[in-house]
Amino acid sequence: MNKNIVILGTQWGDEGKGKVVDCLTKDSSYVVRYQGGHNAGHTLVVNDKKIILHLIPSGLLHKNVIGIIANGVVVSPFELIKEIKMLETHNIFVHKRLFISNSSPLILQYHIEMDIAREKKLGISALGTTGRGIGPAYEDKIARRALRIGDLKNEKTLSIRLEKIVNYYNHQLVSFYKHKPVDYKIILRDLLPTIDLIYDMIKDTTSILHTAIQSNKKIIFEGAQGSFLDIDHGTYPYVTSSNSTIGGVITGTGVGSKSLDYILGVTKAYSTRVGYGPFPTELFDDVDKHFSKKGHEFGSTTGRKRRTGWLDAVALCRSVRINSLSGLCITKLDVLDGLYEIKICTAYKNINTLEIISFPDIDEWKNIEPIYETYPGWNKKTLGIKKLIDLPYEARNYINRIEEITQIPVDIISTGPDRSDIIFVRDIFFIKK
């Protein structure tokens, strides 16, 4: 029996991980966020109500589940409290079942101002960040100057350290970026009231998880972003500032690899990307319009239109290897309904040398042309279908081809936005390792 399951994105984020986490967590005891911050955007549709979570684990919509924001996550206490209050409007109360690692770095106003100032300075070369301070917060962590959640428990020490960090940031903001300074006193004034609201949630979450594992509890590890936004394995420098691949689970929670039983890779039936960076299968035609309209392809965090393209199996296969995936979940299959033909990119070709490239260096991407296989589409609606056998033959053929190319099984298929629009090909809790 698989007790501990990792759910991560195989593309550039926005794969639909939140819904999958929500569906699987109903049978679990814990759900854990292990990297990223409130730059993530997990959209859930429950009883026709849309709920968007940026920081709190998606599985907390189930009232029997305990949520963990682990040490690999950078936390804005203001955004956290905002989400807690938003959930309360849906009669979901998490105060007594959400725990935050005392080691999680804080995101504060100076991180946001630095993020904005840098993007402005870069101009047309900007990376397209969310402007929420994620990168600068991770920089502080690596430079060993970060304020962490645990620091909120000592107001005197917090005040002293905060003033030093603000002085450090203001020197750069004013002198180099010609940006407005931040006010240490205002940051402290705004921060202090948040402490009482989250004080009891601050814990040694690694110990909580170790105890849960020893007690044979089921744990879902919820990834944010996608594999090709990973700081090490993504399309650098157009990446996020954390490890969104499998390594982020281990370092971001303190749970060792032997305790991970099954790794589920979530991929859309096509491809999308928000912001700048390489995207070999990108479309600019009527199919792009079809994906955007039918798939509602606008970022849940930024509101930006997502770039769309055909499924990139070259990238997907690389993600399978990097993450040691056990199986796949294909989402938004219903968005392909009504297309005359469907394509899968199976290789990259350098347009100058005609050489087949496995995975390009950053300077090579601009010379890459996708090589496609083409398959017939289908007219029958797949929206809401719950059994594999009920899918159109062409849709099943498409799924089979993805399995052949990636050499791992497709265990889950999402056929619509609601939590009930899903096909469980296999029960991943009971697949033998």
Swiss-Prot record:
Cofactor requirement: Mg(2+)
PROSITE patterns named in the record: ADENYLOSUCCIN_SYN_1, ADENYLOSUCCIN_SYN_2
Q: Binding residues for Mg(2+), per the UniProt record? A: 14, 41
Single GO MF descriptor: GTP binding
GO BP field: 'de novo' AMP biosynthetic process; IMP metabolic process
Return the broad EC class. ligase
Per the record, the major location class is cytoplasm
Q: In which pathway does it act?
A: Purine metabolism; AMP biosynthesis via de novo pathway; AMP from IMP: step 1/2
Q: Which residues form the active site?
A: 14, 42
Q: Where does IMP bind?
A: 14-17, 39-42, 130, 144, 225, 240, 304
Family matches, as Pfam families: Adenylsucc_synt
Q: Which reaction does it catalyse?
A: IMP + L-aspartate + GTP = N(6)-(1,2-dicarboxyethyl)-AMP + GDP + phosphate + 2 H(+)
Q: One GO CC term of this entry?
A: cytoplasm
Q: Which residues bind substrate?
A: 300-306
- Keywords (A to Z) from UniProt: Cytoplasm, GTP-binding, Ligase, Magnesium, Metal-binding, Nucleotide-binding, Purine biosynthesis
Q: What is its EC number?
A: 6.3.4.4
Q: Which NCBIfam families match?
A: PRK01117.1, purA
Q: What name does UniProt use for this protein?
A: Adenylosuccinate synthetase
